[in-house]
Design a protein with these regions (language model features):
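N-terminal presequence-like segments and the immediate start of the first folded domain
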Residues: 1-54, 58-63, 68-71, 77-125
């Protein structure tokens, strides 16, 4: 098992890694939309969703796989009313066959974020 690190996405100084590579799977910790330069939250559900999915792409590539190999995604939303916008952007990044997925509304996300996504991906053989 190895921890993922990256200088291409914002990484908080907290007691969990960006992700873990274990066996033939990559497990990414939940990603929120922080400006990569400042670490401050990005405004707006569209911009946040784009940033989160872009960060996921980058991290998976650094782990030796791609977003095409995501097998499971969990999306946490501050408001389920944003699901239509999120789905439209999600479809730009994920391709068929789509990964298994859950989307849930939560009462609060860190730093007033609108979205957080965590994924599991298979390593490329």
């Amino acid at each position: 098992m190895r921890q993922l690190t990256s200088d291409k996405v914002y990484e908080l100084d907290l007691p969990f890694p960006l992700g873990i590579v274990d066996g033939n799977r990559v497990y990414l910790s939940g990603r929120t939309a922080r400006d990569p330069e400042t670490g401050y939250p990005i405004d707006g559900i569209e911009e946040q969703t784009e940033r989160v999915l872009t960060d996921i792409e980058v991290l998976l590539e650094e782990a030796g796989t791609s977003i095409d190999n995501v097998v499971q995604a969990t999306i946490y939303l501050a408001s389920m009313s944003d699901i239509g916008v999120v789905n439209d952007i999600y479809e730009e990044y994920m391709t068929e066959p789509y990964p298994a997925r859950s989307a849930v509304e939560v009462s609060d996300l860190a730093a007033d974020f609108d979205i957080e996504i965590e994924v599991v991906a298979a390593l490329e053989e």
